[in-house]
Structure formats: C-alpha cells, structure tokens
A protein has these predicted regions:
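Catalytic cores of nucleic-acid endonucleases
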Residues: 59-62, 67-127
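Acidic-basic catalytic patches of nuclease active cores, encompassing PD-(D/E)XK
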Residues: 1-42
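Generic structural signal for hydrophobic residues
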Residues: 23-27, 114, 173
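Mature, structured domains enriched in cysteine- and short glycine motifs
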Residues: 124-193
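Short, composition-biased local secondary-structure segments
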Residues: 1-4, 70-94, 131-155
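Short, well-structured beta-strand/strand-turn elements
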Residues: 37-45, 181-188
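Active-site metal-binding core of divalent-cation-utilizing nuclease and nuclease-like domains
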Residues: 38-59
Length: 193
C-alpha cells in the first residue's frame, strides 16, 4: 500500500513549486552521495529561504546553493545571482567561523551578463545540470535506534538526515526499505500521550 502511494505521488500532476523542490532534493541527494551533510532550506522554509535552497557542509566548508529547474528555452538573469550573493554574504556574517561558497545550479543556462556577474561575485555555477532519477525513500534510525523509512510526502522528510553509515541509506522501493529492516514512519500527532 505504501509503494502504491509513492508511485501515485511520483506520477501526480506537479506544480512549479513541486518541480523546484524535486530538483532541490535531487541535487541534495547527489551531494549526500559525495559525503556532504545537507540541510534542505528551500523545502522547509519555502519563500522565506532567502535564496538558499540547500546548505551542504563537508570538511569545515559550507556550500550555499540555489537551484533552478527551468525549461531549456529559459535563461537565468543576473537578479538570481545577486540574490544568492546577498544571501551568502548574510550567512557569512551570521557564521563568521564558517568558510562558505555560493553555488548556483540550474537545468538551463545563464545570460552572458549573469555569467559575468557570477564570476565577479565569485559564485560557482553549474549550468545544464539535468534532473535525474534517484531513490526517494530516506531510511535512518531514530534516537531510540528504531529503523524508520520516510516517503517524500511525509511531514519530516526534508529534516531526515541520510549519511554514509549502516543505520542510514536511500531505497528505491518500500519493499527494499522493509527488506533492510526499516518500518514506515508513524504520522505525528500533537499532544499524543
């Protein structure tokens, strides 16, 4: 029943918001595979994310990442780079001991002016980075050691940390997650005794 729910969720009609979050999660997954600890800001704060979709930390360095999943015929203009630059500056001020780097990742291309602005502002840019398929089920152990899996429509999904250890992984299907000894996350109910 949970696999059917996941399949229905994957095949539903998606809003622009859903498409953006899906891309942020994909980029976050790729970074986690490279050993980064990823915080999903855009998915949890929405429009209040200040242009920071992801924070990815590894070896004392934090990447402040803005993701844009746009149609190929669209072009990214400089205002998006300026927003990221300002957001990275605020982050650096608020976290003075952290070495940080602004990174802009998109499925399309930047205008020539936007490229020059990125270079001037020392923003790393990844253009034409397509959305790919990846395992959507997050599996981890809770504070009591219970092995739990989370589906992308679960309330806490974007707060679940997946790291490279035996108690944490991604799975393609609910059957795979259950075969690894994980159970479905319970729905959270406030004031439950």
């Amino acid at each position: 029943k949970y696999q059917r729910a996941l399949n229905n969720w994957k095949n539903r009609k998606k809003s622009d918001w859903d498409i953006g979050i899906e891309y942020e999660r994909y980029i976050g997954y790729k970074l986690e595979c490279e050993g980064y600890k990823v915080t999903y800001i855009g998915a949890t704060l929405g429009l209040k994310d200040m242009g920071r979709d992801l924070l990815a930390t590894k070896n004392g360095k934090t990447l402040i990442i803005q993701c844009k999943r746009w149609a190929k015929e669209k072009t990214i203009h400089e205002k998006h780079l300026f927003q990221l630059y300002g957001s990275a500056a605020v982050y650096a001020i608020e976290h003075p001991i952290t070495h940080c780097k602004a990174v802009f990742i998109t499925t399309t291309e930047l205008s020539e002016v936007a490229r020059k602005c990125a270079e001037y502002c020392d923003i790393a840019v990844v253009e034409n980075c397509p959305m790919g398929d990846y395992p959507l089920i997050k599996c981890n152990a809770n504070k009591d050691g219970e092995k739990i899996y989370h589906l992308p429509f679960d309330q806490q999904y974007d707060k679940v940390v997946v790291s490279k250890n035996k108690q944490s992984c991604y799975a393609w299907t609910t059957y795979e997650a259950e075969g690894l000894g994980f159970r479905r996350a319970y729905r959270w109910h406030p004031n439950k005794s």
